[in-house]
Structure formats: C-alpha cells, structure tokens
C-alpha cells in the first residue's frame, strides 16, 4: 500500500511541476492541458533521462532523475511566473473543471491499484519479459 502512495505522490508532483508548461503549450485545449499533465510529466522526465543516459551525458541514477525533475520544474516555474496573471485567472475560473479532472484521475488510479492488488503476480502474457527488462534497466547506469 505504501508503494501506491509513493506512486501517487510522485505522479501528482510531476503533474503539478509540468502544469505551467502544459498551460502555455496546450492553450487551445479547454482545460489548458491540465488533464494530461501527469502522463506528460512522466514522459518528459523519462524521455530527457533516457536521451541523456543513452548519449552517456549523465548516468541513469536517482540523482540524475532528481536533477532532471528540478530542471523541468524550474523551467515550469519560470513559465508560471511569466504568465502568473493569466494562470491565476484560469485556475479561478475553471476550478470546478480542474477538481473534476483530479477526482476522475484519483478514482481511476486507486481503482486500478485495487484491481491489480487482487492479482499482482507476474505470470501471464508478456509480463515475465517485461519484468526481465525492468530488472535489467534498474541495474543499468546508461541508456545503451
């Protein structure tokens, strides 16, 4: 259960860190990208870490991930500061939409965590191979 909480905290933090970027880049969407900030945060940090690791610029270790998250959050904070008035107006005007999107995410996240808790085994379809790749990637310090 503690792992689910850590995943939730991590995903929420990444989503919050990326929201100002999504707000600026996805301005044509009705929610200004709020509903995609969580996967966008995971993909952005993961892609940057993968590229930097594959090019042997930085090792693929926890410290590198933390630095990448801080850099992404810094850029996002700068975007938030430069668009703070517009961002504040949007959040105040669309708070019901933002809360609804967050509730939907939490219900789906916790529902899927409960569903997977009934059969957490890695014993069907491609999961054994996925698990092997996952274990190999944990031990690797570069993306090659």
Regions from the language model: what does each represent?
Residues 1, 93-101, 107-144:
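Active-site lumenal/periplasmic loops and adjacent helix-entry segments of GT-C-fold
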Residues 1-95:
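Membrane-embedded, hydrophobic transmembrane alpha-helices
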Residues 15-17, 105-108:
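Short, compositionally biased low-complexity segments
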């Amino acid at each position: 259960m503690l792992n689910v909480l850590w995943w939730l905290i991590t995903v929420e933090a990444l989503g919050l860190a990326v929201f100002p970027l999504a707000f600026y880049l996805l301005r044509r969407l009705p929610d200004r990208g709020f509903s995609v900030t969580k996967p966008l945060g995971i993909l952005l940090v993961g892609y940057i870490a993968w590229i930097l690791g594959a090019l042997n610029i930085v090792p693929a270790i926890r410290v590198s991930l933390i630095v990448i998250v801080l850099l992404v959050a810094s850029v996002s904070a700068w975007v938030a500061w430069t668009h703070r008035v517009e961002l504040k107006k949007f959040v105040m005007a669309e708070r019901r939409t933002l809360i609804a999107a967050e509730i939907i995410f939490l219900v789906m996240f916790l529902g899927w965590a409960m569903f997977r808790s009934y059969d957490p085994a890695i014993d069907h379809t491609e999961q054994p191979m996925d698990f092997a790749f996952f274990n190999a990637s944990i031990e690797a310090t570069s993306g090659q």
